[in-house]
Amino acid sequence: MKAICIVAGEASGRIYFKQGAPDEPVSITGYLLNLPRGLHGFHVHEFGDTSNGCTSAGEHFNPTRQRHGAPDAAERHVGDLGNVRSAGCTALTAIHMSDNVITLFGPLSILGRSLVVHTDRDDLGLGEHPLSKTTGNSGGRLGCGIIGVCAN
């Protein structure tokens, strides 16, 4: 199955998701534009509503009620994809990652939910800030889009 997310906002781009079967990892590829230099939190959020500056997307997708964590942590939200690194606003930020927790199949599917790129670095739940265990203290929302099925 394949899915696409058209990211819009201060940051924009296209992100593609591909998963061959429910028990296989999801390949995440694409690009983002206009990202300030540095690391930016990158998460699937619970709702496919991208209005109000992406705030209507809700919290990180967390159907299993876990603490926030790194993509490779034993405990994490389903939507915790870590960080993307940008070389600066004039550079294209290429996205190439794989994730074993998100899925395009079944009741925990990310289809119809939103993808959000944040203003700040995700501390992966390891920081001292009170928001570390829920959002990774990753700040505001630079861009977002709805994850939808695309043609093969």
From Swiss-Prot:
Classification via Pfam families: Sod_Cu
InterPro entries registered for this protein in UniProt: SOD-like_Cu/Zn_dom_sf, SOD_Cu/Zn_/chaperone, SOD_Cu/Zn_BS, SOD_Cu_Zn_dom
Disulfide bonds: C54-C144
Chain positions recorded as Zn(2+) binding sites: H60, H68, H77, D80
Keywords: Antioxidant, Copper, Disulfide bond, Late protein, Metal-binding, Oxidoreductase, Zinc
Residues annotated for Cu cation binding in this entry: H43, H45, H60, H118
Cofactor: Cu cation; Zn(2+)
GO MF entries: copper ion binding; superoxide dismutase activity
Cofactor note: Binds 1 copper ion per subunit. Binds 1 zinc ion per subunit.
Cited CDD domains: Cu-Zn_Superoxide_Dismutase (cd00305)
Record-listed E.C. numbers: 1.15.1.1
PROSITE patterns for this protein: SOD_CU_ZN_1, SOD_CU_ZN_2
Catalytic activity: 2 superoxide + 2 H(+) = H2O2 + O2
Known role: Destroys radicals which are normally produced within the cells and which are toxic to biological systems.
Homology family: Belongs to the Cu-Zn superoxide dismutase family.
The protein's name in its UniProt record: Putative superoxide dismutase [Cu-Zn]
